[in-house]
Regions:
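PLP-dependent amino-acid enzyme catalytic core
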Residues: 1-170
């Protein structure tokens, strides 16, 4: 979308988050036609869609306790710094967003769990800005940029994708 702005937490920059789309897909009974209507038709035409009338969404909201919040670049840097100072652990920018918002929703006596979402090395520039040094690179990623890249564009056809995977498994 033309309204999407680049930030130091790029998964938050996308207008159509695939993980959210996947969640809604599963929530609504894995109905591809309904997902297309929501994410392609309604979102493109109106910039949003509303699930509040859906019984499945009402149930999920109650079950999962949806909450939201925001995190700016400055918040992200401060959270990375505070986690490092407190735990001597480097977290990535997405996890920092989650920690920042989770801290706002904490309740006394109620545990809060935030799952790490990426490796800090993926966001080395922001980690360096926050901590004054680059995060360590896991050994398994040394030289990854020099490895060959393989890309195959295919139509959005489940049968063709499955066939390609089966034929190209090594």
């Amino acid at each position: 979308s033309s309204d999407t702005q680049e930030t130091s937490s790029p998964s938050m920059d996308i207008s159509k988050a695939s993980n959210f789309e996947r969640f809604v897909f599963n929530l609504l009974g894995r109905d591809g036609a309904q997902i297309r209507a929501l994410f392609h038709d309604q979102l493109n035409a109106h910039g949003s869609f509303d699930l509040s009338a859906s019984e499945a969404f009402k149930s999920a909201a109650e079950t999962y306790g949806f909450q939201s919040g925001k995190s700016t670049h400055a918040d992200r840097l401060a959270t990375i710094q505070s986690i490092y100072a407190q735990f001597n652990d480097i977290i990535d920018t997405h996890t920092a967003d989650g920690v920042k918002v989770a801290r706002e929703h904490m309740q006394p006596g109620v545990p809060m769990i935030v799952l790490e979402t990426a490796l800090p090395i993926k966001f080395a520039e922001t980690i360096e800005e926050a901590l004054g040094r680059l995060p360590p690179r896991p050994a398994r990623f040394e030289g990854i940029e020099a490895l060959p890249k393989r890309v195959r564009l295919m139509p959005a056809d489940v049968a063709q994708i499955k066939s390609y995977i089966v034929q190209n498994l090594h």
